[in-house]
Amino acid sequence: MAPKAKIVLVGSGMIGGVMATLIVQKNLGDVVMFDIVKNMPHGKALDTSHTNVMAYSNCKVSGSNTYDDLKDADVVIVTAGFTKAPGKSDKEWNRDDLLPLNNKIMIEIGGHIKNNCPNAFIIVVTNPVDVMVQLLHQHSGVPKNKIVGLGGVLDTSRLKYYISQKLNVCPRDVNAHIVGAHGNKMVLLKRYITVGGIPLQEFINNKKITDQELDAIFDRTINTALEIVNLHASPYVAPAAAIIEMAESYIRDLRKVLICSTLLEGQYGHKDIFAGTPLVIGGNGVEQVIELQLNADEKKKFDEAVAETSRMKALI
């Protein structure tokens, strides 16, 4: 990697805007904000570049409407894609409708990555992410350790926050794992939740939280995106922060353990499919895939999550 990382945001919408700001605040590298909307990324880049002063940073932020600016990127973050089916009302479409539309975008982006930055570390955000990350992996030809999908970092941040609020503790003191898939099939692992290193079961035993309250928190975690949308907003700040945590671990070789969608090669009994599991992300990309020991019920839910990803992939 060059002394200063080149980070290209493919998609400069709401998530892209927050990501660019966080990159400057952390002084992670130079940013290219790419989008197909003419001039828009240039305006956002100009605005964001001014925050260098307040952040005591020195990051170049530029806008682009051409894929040529992917050239020699160190990190590529892909948020581009449809979030709903065009021409259909909210009641007329479902996530399956996005598959052919976003697959075309992955084909296009993958070709440009292959030609311009085949050694970059790729983070895929486009939904359904566990399918799209596999498609972009195929279309770009990047090594399996150089591409991951957003999922568990965001999902667990929500779960950790809700638990911390119930127990009145610092959110960072809650540790939790969500594996399998990003979406309704995510697998929340109650057995692995700790608070300050103490198993959550101790807090249940001491009546600080009940199983029913925990189940409600699980349900809220799964449905958080819908909750935000129903409040006439859009989830983009926390997703952006989760993505930048992943990128920073790669750029700065932090070797953080982060839950992301990665290519399974026998873990959990599955091969040639992307799914969420803890990873060590460092300067070489995915440096270790951590397979958690699941009980029968957890394994059944994990298998169902993978089956849903396989079903969607088969529709393309």
Curated annotation (Swiss-Prot):
Spell out the reaction equation it catalyses: (S)-lactate + NAD(+) = pyruvate + NADH + H(+)
Q: Which UniProt keywords apply?
A: NAD, Oxidoreductase, Pyruvate
InterPro entries under this entry?
Answer: L-lactate/malate_DH, Lactate/malate_DH_C, Lactate/malate_DH_N, Lactate_DH/Glyco_Ohase_4_C, Malate_DH_type3, NAD(P)-bd_dom_sf
What is the active site of this protein? Answer: H182 (proton acceptor)
Q: What is its EC number?
A: 1.1.1.27
Task: Give GO terms for biological process.
Answer: glycolytic process; lactate metabolic process; pyruvate biosynthetic process
Give the domain of life. Answer: Eukaryota
Pathway(s) the chain acts in? Fermentation; pyruvate fermentation to lactate; (S)-lactate from pyruvate: step 1/1
User: One MF term from GO for this chain?
Assistant: oxidoreductase activity
Q: Name a Pfam family for this protein.
A: Ldh_1_C
Q: Where on this chain does NAD(+) bind?
A: 13-15, 34-36, 67, 79-83, 125-127, 150, 154, 182
Where along the chain is substrate bound? R95, R158, H182
Family according to the record: Belongs to the LDH/MDH superfamily. LDH family.
Q: How does it assemble?
A: Homotetramer.
Protein name (Swiss-Prot/TrEMBL): L-lactate dehydrogenase
